[in-house]
Protein backbone atom coordinates (compact mmCIF):
# COMPACT_ATOMS: atom_id res chain seq x y z
CA UNK A 1 0.00 0.00 0.00
CA UNK A 2 1.17 3.52 -0.85
CA UNK A 3 -0.76 6.15 1.06
CA UNK A 4 -0.23 9.78 1.94
CA UNK A 5 0.19 11.92 5.06
CA UNK A 6 -1.40 15.41 5.15
CA UNK A 7 1.41 17.37 6.83
CA UNK A 8 1.67 19.82 3.93
CA UNK A 9 -1.94 20.84 4.60
CA UNK A 10 -1.46 20.99 8.37
CA UNK A 11 1.69 23.10 8.29
CA UNK A 12 -0.17 26.37 7.73
CA UNK A 13 -3.13 25.65 10.05
CA UNK A 14 -3.51 26.72 13.70
CA UNK A 15 -2.27 23.94 15.95
CA UNK A 16 -1.61 21.85 12.83
CA UNK A 17 -5.27 20.80 13.08
CA UNK A 18 -6.39 19.35 9.75
CA UNK A 19 -10.04 19.01 10.80
CA UNK A 20 -11.24 22.06 8.80
CA UNK A 21 -9.72 20.72 5.57
CA UNK A 22 -10.50 17.00 5.83
CA UNK A 23 -12.86 17.16 2.84
CA UNK A 24 -10.16 18.71 0.68
CA UNK A 25 -7.56 16.21 1.87
CA UNK A 26 -9.69 13.19 0.97
CA UNK A 27 -10.69 14.72 -2.38
CA UNK A 28 -7.11 15.61 -3.31
CA UNK A 29 -5.61 12.28 -2.29
CA UNK A 30 -8.33 10.33 -4.07
CA UNK A 31 -7.54 12.30 -7.22
CA UNK A 32 -3.82 11.61 -6.73
CA UNK A 33 -4.39 7.87 -6.81
CA UNK A 34 -2.97 6.89 -3.43
CA UNK A 35 -4.27 3.81 -1.63
CA UNK A 36 -5.09 5.35 1.74
CA UNK A 37 -4.81 8.30 4.13
CA UNK A 38 -2.69 8.55 7.26
CA UNK A 39 -4.42 11.05 9.53
CA UNK A 40 -2.85 13.20 12.24
CA UNK A 41 -3.54 13.07 15.96
CA UNK A 42 -4.77 16.66 15.80
CA UNK A 43 -7.92 15.58 13.97
CA UNK A 44 -8.57 12.54 16.14
CA UNK A 45 -8.65 14.57 19.33
CA UNK A 46 -12.12 15.74 18.26
CA UNK A 47 -14.69 13.28 19.58
CA UNK A 48 -17.14 14.12 16.77
CA UNK A 49 -14.68 13.49 13.92
CA UNK A 50 -15.31 9.75 13.61
CA UNK A 51 -18.58 9.82 11.58
CA UNK A 52 -17.18 12.54 9.35
CA UNK A 53 -14.02 10.56 8.56
CA UNK A 54 -16.01 7.39 7.99
CA UNK A 55 -18.24 9.23 5.53
CA UNK A 56 -15.28 10.74 3.66
CA UNK A 57 -13.53 7.38 3.51
CA UNK A 58 -16.62 5.77 1.98
CA UNK A 59 -17.34 8.67 -0.36
CA UNK A 60 -13.84 8.69 -1.83
CA UNK A 61 -13.20 4.94 -1.47
CA UNK A 62 -10.04 5.84 0.44
CA UNK A 63 -9.26 3.79 3.56
CA UNK A 64 -7.76 5.33 6.67
CA UNK A 65 -4.37 3.71 7.29
CA UNK A 66 -3.93 5.07 10.79
CA UNK A 67 -2.47 8.25 12.26
CA UNK A 68 0.73 9.96 13.28
CA UNK A 69 1.25 10.87 16.93
CA UNK A 70 3.78 12.79 18.98
CA UNK A 71 4.28 13.37 22.71
CA UNK A 72 7.17 14.01 25.16
CA UNK A 73 7.37 10.39 26.27
CA UNK A 74 10.76 10.92 27.89
CA UNK A 75 9.10 13.20 30.48
CA UNK A 76 7.68 10.92 33.17
CA UNK A 77 5.68 13.79 34.67
CA UNK A 78 3.58 13.90 31.48
CA UNK A 79 2.81 10.17 31.36
CA UNK A 80 -0.71 10.28 32.81
CA UNK A 81 -1.67 13.06 30.40
CA UNK A 82 -0.13 11.22 27.44
CA UNK A 83 -1.90 7.97 28.32
CA UNK A 84 -5.31 9.65 28.42
CA UNK A 85 -4.69 11.48 25.16
CA UNK A 86 -3.24 8.49 23.31
CA UNK A 87 -6.00 6.15 24.47
CA UNK A 88 -8.60 8.43 22.88
CA UNK A 89 -6.61 8.86 19.65
CA UNK A 90 -5.90 5.14 19.29
CA UNK A 91 -9.53 4.25 19.95
CA UNK A 92 -10.63 6.61 17.19
CA UNK A 93 -8.04 5.19 14.79
CA UNK A 94 -9.75 1.83 15.22
CA UNK A 95 -13.22 3.37 14.89
CA UNK A 96 -12.38 4.85 11.48
CA UNK A 97 -10.84 1.59 10.26
CA UNK A 98 -7.16 2.39 10.77
CA UNK A 99 -4.51 -0.08 11.87
CA UNK A 100 -1.28 1.88 12.44
CA UNK A 101 0.05 4.47 14.88
CA UNK A 102 3.29 6.13 13.81
CA UNK A 103 4.64 7.83 16.90
CA UNK A 104 7.46 10.22 17.69
CA UNK A 105 8.83 10.18 21.22
CA UNK A 106 9.41 13.91 21.65
CA UNK A 107 12.48 16.11 21.36
CA UNK A 108 14.08 17.14 24.66
CA UNK A 109 16.21 19.72 22.78
CA UNK A 110 19.27 18.07 24.32
CA UNK A 111 20.69 14.59 24.78
CA UNK A 112 18.35 12.50 26.90
CA UNK A 113 19.77 10.86 30.00
CA UNK A 114 19.31 7.15 30.75
CA UNK A 115 16.38 7.74 33.12
CA UNK A 116 14.56 9.66 30.38
CA UNK A 117 15.16 6.89 27.87
CA UNK A 118 13.79 4.47 30.48
CA UNK A 119 10.65 6.61 30.85
CA UNK A 120 10.32 6.86 27.06
CA UNK A 121 10.48 3.09 26.67
CA UNK A 122 8.00 2.56 29.51
CA UNK A 123 5.50 4.86 27.81
CA UNK A 124 6.00 3.17 24.45
CA UNK A 125 5.35 -0.26 25.96
CA UNK A 126 2.09 0.99 27.46
CA UNK A 127 1.00 2.56 24.17
CA UNK A 128 1.89 -0.63 22.30
CA UNK A 129 -0.44 -2.49 24.64
CA UNK A 130 -3.30 -0.04 24.05
CA UNK A 131 -2.69 -0.33 20.31
CA UNK A 132 -2.84 -4.12 20.48
CA UNK A 133 -6.19 -3.94 22.32
CA UNK A 134 -7.53 -1.91 19.38
CA UNK A 135 -6.01 -3.90 16.51
CA UNK A 136 -3.45 -1.17 15.84
CA UNK A 137 0.31 -1.62 15.31
CA UNK A 138 2.66 1.01 16.75
CA UNK A 139 5.74 2.01 14.77
CA UNK A 140 8.51 4.43 15.70
CA UNK A 141 8.58 7.44 13.41
CA UNK A 142 11.70 9.60 13.32
CA UNK A 143 12.57 13.21 12.83
CA UNK A 144 16.22 14.25 12.95
CA UNK A 145 16.58 14.17 16.74
CA UNK A 146 15.96 10.42 17.05
CA UNK A 147 18.66 9.45 14.57
CA UNK A 148 21.38 12.10 14.88
CA UNK A 149 24.55 11.45 16.91
CA UNK A 150 24.93 7.88 15.66
CA UNK A 151 21.21 7.20 16.21
CA UNK A 152 21.62 7.73 19.97
CA UNK A 153 17.93 8.22 20.79
CA UNK A 154 16.68 5.43 18.54
CA UNK A 155 19.33 3.00 19.75
CA UNK A 156 18.41 3.87 23.33
CA UNK A 157 14.81 2.93 22.62
CA UNK A 158 15.68 -0.28 20.78
CA UNK A 159 18.02 -1.38 23.57
CA UNK A 160 15.02 -1.21 25.90
CA UNK A 161 12.38 -2.50 23.44
CA UNK A 162 14.18 -5.00 21.19
CA UNK A 163 11.04 -5.95 19.26
CA UNK A 164 9.91 -2.38 18.45
CA UNK A 165 8.62 -1.79 14.92
CA UNK A 166 10.02 1.10 12.86
CA UNK A 167 8.42 3.62 10.53
CA UNK A 168 11.37 5.70 9.32
CA UNK A 169 11.05 9.03 7.56
CA UNK A 170 13.50 8.74 4.68
CA UNK A 171 14.01 12.49 4.22
CA UNK A 172 14.74 13.04 7.92
CA UNK A 173 17.29 10.21 7.78
CA UNK A 174 19.06 12.12 5.00
CA UNK A 175 18.80 15.32 7.04
CA UNK A 176 20.52 13.58 9.96
CA UNK A 177 23.23 12.28 7.60
CA UNK A 178 22.07 8.68 7.99
CA UNK A 179 22.34 6.77 4.71
CA UNK A 180 18.83 5.41 3.98
CA UNK A 181 19.87 2.25 2.13
CA UNK A 182 22.17 1.28 4.98
CA UNK A 183 19.41 2.02 7.49
CA UNK A 184 16.96 -0.22 5.61
CA UNK A 185 19.48 -3.05 5.45
CA UNK A 186 20.35 -2.74 9.14
CA UNK A 187 16.78 -2.56 10.38
CA UNK A 188 14.86 -4.20 7.54
CA UNK A 189 13.06 -6.81 9.62
CA UNK A 190 11.68 -4.14 11.94
CA UNK A 191 10.45 -1.71 9.28
CA UNK A 192 6.69 -1.84 8.78
CA UNK A 193 6.11 1.70 7.52
CA UNK A 194 8.03 4.53 5.87
CA UNK A 195 7.40 8.18 5.08
CA UNK A 196 8.64 9.42 1.70
CA UNK A 197 9.62 12.96 0.75
CA UNK A 198 12.31 14.42 -1.50
CA UNK A 199 14.88 17.17 -1.07
CA UNK A 200 17.17 19.08 -3.39
CA UNK A 201 20.96 19.04 -3.25
CA UNK A 202 20.94 22.11 -0.98
CA UNK A 203 18.70 20.32 1.53
CA UNK A 204 15.55 22.27 0.65
CA UNK A 205 12.42 20.17 0.21
CA UNK A 206 11.27 19.66 -3.36
CA UNK A 207 7.67 20.36 -4.32
CA UNK A 208 7.03 16.76 -5.33
CA UNK A 209 8.91 13.50 -5.24
CA UNK A 210 11.21 13.05 -8.21
CA UNK A 211 12.22 16.72 -8.16
CA UNK A 212 15.01 16.21 -5.64
CA UNK A 213 18.15 14.13 -5.27
CA UNK A 214 17.30 11.33 -2.83
CA UNK A 215 18.03 7.99 -4.51
CA UNK A 216 14.62 6.39 -4.15
CA UNK A 217 15.42 3.76 -6.77
CA UNK A 218 18.14 2.39 -4.47
CA UNK A 219 15.82 2.66 -1.47
CA UNK A 220 13.13 0.71 -3.32
CA UNK A 221 15.67 -2.03 -4.10
CA UNK A 222 16.75 -2.15 -0.46
CA UNK A 223 13.15 -2.50 0.69
CA UNK A 224 12.60 -5.42 -1.67
CA UNK A 225 15.90 -7.03 -0.63
CA UNK A 226 14.74 -6.94 2.99
CA UNK A 227 11.28 -8.31 2.10
CA UNK A 228 9.44 -5.16 3.13
CA UNK A 229 5.69 -5.81 3.16
CA UNK A 230 4.43 -2.74 5.00
CA UNK A 231 3.01 0.63 4.01
CA UNK A 232 4.66 3.61 2.34
CA UNK A 233 3.25 7.11 2.85
CA UNK A 234 4.06 10.14 0.73
CA UNK A 235 4.48 13.11 3.09
CA UNK A 236 5.12 16.32 1.20
CA UNK A 237 6.43 19.47 2.89
CA UNK A 238 7.28 22.97 1.77
CA UNK A 239 10.05 25.23 3.05
CA UNK A 240 8.93 28.37 4.86
CA UNK A 241 7.71 31.05 2.45
CA UNK A 242 7.45 28.66 -0.51
CA UNK A 243 4.77 29.46 -3.10
CA UNK A 244 3.53 26.26 -4.79
CA UNK A 245 3.69 26.19 -8.58
CA UNK A 246 0.83 23.68 -8.83
CA UNK A 247 -2.14 22.48 -6.74
CA UNK A 248 -1.21 20.06 -3.95
CA UNK A 249 -3.28 17.32 -5.55
CA UNK A 250 -1.05 17.49 -8.63
CA UNK A 251 2.11 17.23 -6.54
CA UNK A 252 0.70 14.19 -4.76
CA UNK A 253 -0.28 12.66 -8.10
CA UNK A 254 3.21 13.24 -9.53
CA UNK A 255 4.70 11.76 -6.37
CA UNK A 256 2.48 8.68 -6.50
CA UNK A 257 3.43 8.08 -10.12
CA UNK A 258 7.11 8.52 -9.22
CA UNK A 259 6.94 5.96 -6.39
CA UNK A 260 5.33 3.46 -8.76
CA UNK A 261 7.78 4.11 -11.60
CA UNK A 262 11.03 4.46 -9.66
CA UNK A 263 10.54 2.46 -6.45
CA UNK A 264 8.30 -0.24 -7.88
CA UNK A 265 5.52 0.22 -5.31
Task: Describe these PLM feature segments.
Residues 31-34, 98, 163, 191, ...:
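A structural motif
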Residues 59-60, 75-166, 173-175, 249:
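Active-site acidic/histidine proton-transfer and metal-coordination neighborhood
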Residues 22-26, 50-54, 86-90, 121-128, ...:
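Generic structural signal for well-ordered alpha-helices
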Residues 233-244, 248:
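A short, acidic, flexible beta-alpha connecting loop/helix-capping segment that sits on the rim
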Residues 36-37, 67, 126-213, 220:
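Acidic/histidine-rich catalytic cores of soluble enzymes
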Residues 4-8, 39-42, 66-71, 103-105, ...:
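A cross-domain feature marking catalytic cores of carbohydrate-active enzymes
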Residues 13-18, 39-50, 72-82, 108-112, ...:
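Acidic-and-aromatic substrate-binding clefts and catalytic sites of carbohydrate-active enzymes
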Residues 1-96, 132, 136, 165, ...:
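N-terminal pre-domain/capping segments
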